From Swiss-Prot:
It is found in: Membrane. The keyword Manganese does not apply. Its EC number is 1.-.-.-. The gene is avaL. The chain crosses the membrane at residues 19-39. GO terms for cellular component: membrane. The keyword Heme applies. Belongs to the cytochrome P450 family. This is Cytochrome P450 monooxygenase avaL. It is a single-pass membrane protein. SUPFAM superfamilies: Cytochrome P450. Pathway: Secondary metabolite biosynthesis. Heme binds at residue 508. Its cofactor is heme.
Length: 561
């Protein structure tokens, strides 16, 4: 109503020439903002800036270089600023020794993430204190809102300010009950998408094929089978994600005081997508809300139902229970999870096939592990499920948490892929919000408004933590094999030296769900397909993001033996 009213007012009271003049003014102000940001290098006593060439245009060149090579200045700072000479690189260190051997020097790098400002990189000795800092001093929420502009890009401030989705995630997607549902949809989505070709067949674009499959699987747990198999629903969900990234990039180029004015136009496509999802789910949401409080055993147990329950308990239940707000949360959760899982699994497949081209034998070893799990359970219920999937052409069964827990090598392989193919060079982003700043134990102080992060790529490739870190070792995380002391095999286990899901109180709440999903995806491929080994297609860096090749295809056939 408000948007249509604004449009009516503009059409009846404002001339197109004045609109054009306003747009030109916004462009001029934004251009001046960008130029000033690129030329101005603020002085910060005691905290070195890394990666800025000399000269008046050095800052501009550094920001430009960070678009395609954002990893370079962070690697330089980690190597030359935040480190002291190590003990012998071949000597195994405990985590405590490793942290002691680092200097604890914070450094800053220019970045597009913070609207051409600096991101302050927290070295390893300070990570425990950094993660333990109270939210009212070092804020995860403010970091999200400032860096990712979530009140705009995710279409509401409630996703960060009122995170009731966390309770919904914990109640539905972290207890193991989701495994059976995920397993069923994994089989259905691969059967529909890849089918079981008897001859070698090329999947033209692996990343986007997996994105479609993963989005379907995830939404089986989010909204149920009916809607996750609705192509309009899935395609709208998929289209939402790149538009978030595009809108975020545009809004970073615009001064903060102009964003409320410009954002309705910038966000118009994703607002339309939200309206479309609302039109698909609206009646279902109304039906489910009418069932609240009933003891009907047929009530759904998916994430949407949990969101409705959590919204009803909220002090702002009227606003939170609005169907459009519930849809907004679903879109945000799809954005956060689906792209990340698709990137991670695409990286894993390319690493596996590259290892096969090198003759390392991981494919057969993992296939044997999954085969043994598949064959070991011959209960009547499981045998019936095997017959059910066999009728569809798939070698599969009704999986549960006990089955997936037996995938030791598969899980170690996937965790090694998350380490080796880290999808970003900066993680655990925060903003200093304490008016007095925040002082670390080594005396270094970050001022209010400072944006900070942890150098995850460098930590995951640190030879003091991971012997021969540039070698992909699928057995690295098996119990008693390789790596730093005290490591556990579980992908979902976080620490200061394994940060794929963050660490501490702000670790990814969906990591248990994601780890189960990745294992099931790989298990299905191992049981049902042969894949031609290839050398790994070249990866791509976009700012701080490390992406697999987005255009490379994959050649498969139905398993022949």
């Amino acid at each position: 109503m408000l948007a249509s009213g604004v449009v009516y007012f503009l059409e009846t009271h404002v001339s197109w020439s004045s609109i054009a003049a306003s747009c030109a003014l916004v462009c001029i102000v934004s251009a001046c903002y960008v130029v000033w940001s690129l030329l101005h290098v603020p002085y910060d006593q005691g905290i070195p800036a890394v990666g800025i060439p000399k000269g008046i245009l050095g800052r501009a060149k550094a920001v430009y270089d960070s678009i395609a090579h954002g990893d370079v200045p962070i690697a330089e700072g980690y190597r030359s600023v935040s480190s002291e000479p190590f003990k012998a690189a071949t000597e195994a260190l405990t985590v405590a020794q490793w942290q002691h051997n680092k200097s604890g020097q914070i450094f800053r790098v220019p970045s597009l993430m913070d609207s051409f400002s600096f991101v302050y990189v927290i070295p390893s000795p300070l990570i425990p204190q950094y993660n333990a800092a109270p939210e009212e001093r070092v804020s995860f929420t403010s970091g999200l809102e400032h860096l990712d502009l979530t009140p705009y890009t995710l279409l509401s401030h409630r996703f960060t300010q009122s995170p009731l989705h966390l309770g919904a995630l914990r109640s539905t997607l972290s207890g193991g009950r989701e495994v059976e549902v995920l397993a069923d949809e994994v089989a259905t989505s691969f059967t529909t998408s890849w089918k079981f070709p008897s001859q070698w067949t090329t999947i033209p674009n692996l990343y986007y094929s997996l994105l479609d499959i993963i989005t379907r699987d995830v939404n089986r747990a989010y909204v149920g089978a009916e809607f996750c198999r609705n192509r309009d629903y899935i395609e709208t969900i998929i289209d939402f994600t790149p538009e978030v990234v595009r809108c975020r990039t545009i809004l970073r180029l615009i001064p903060g005081f102009l964003r409320p004015i410009v954002s309705p136009y910038v966000l118009r496509h994703n607002r339309a997508r939200r309206d479309k999802i609302h039109s698909i789910l609206g009646d279902e949401i109304k039906k489910r809300k009418s069932m609240l409080g009933s003891k009907d055993s047929s009530k759904p147990t998916d994430l949407l139902q949990a969101l409705i329950v959590e919204a009803n308990k909220s002090p702002q239940s009227t606003a939170e229970s609005d169907p459009k707000m519930l849809v907004t949360r679903l879109l945000a959760l799809n954005f956060v999870g689906n792209r990340t899982a698709s990137v991670a699994f695409t990286h894993a497949i390319w690493s596996l096939l590259h290892c096969e081209s090198q003759g390392l034998g991981y494919w057969n070893a993992m296939r044997e592990e999954v085969e043994n799990i598949f064959a070991s359970d011959d209960s009547d219920e499981i045998n019936e499920s095997k017959k059910h999937y066999q009728a569809q052409g798939a070698r599969w069964m009704r999986w549960n948490k006990t089955h997936t827990a037996q995938m030791g090598l598969v899980e170690s392989f996937l965790k090694e892929s998350l380490r080796y193919n880290t999808d970003t060079n900066l993680e655990c982003k925060r903003m200093i919000v304490d008016p007095e700043g925040y002082r670390f134990k080594n005396g270094m102080n970050l001022k209010r408004g400072t944006v900070s992060a942890v150098p995850i790529w460098q930590i995951h490739h640190d030879p003091d933590l991971y012997p021969e870190p540039e070698d992909f070792d699928a057995r690295r995380f098996l119990q008693g094999d390789g790596g730093a002391q005290g490591r556990k095999v579980g992908m979902q286990t976080t620490s200061e030296y394994f940060l794929a899901f963050g660490v501490g109180k702000h670790a990814c709440p969906g990591r248990f769900f994601a780890s189960q999903h990745l294992k099931l995806l790989l298990a299905f491929i191992l049981l049902n397909y042969d894949i031609q080994p290839v050398s790994r297609p070249e990866d791509e860096w976009y700012g701080s993001s490390h992406m697999p090749n987005m255009a490379a295809g994959l050649t498969i056939r139905a398993r022949q033996d």
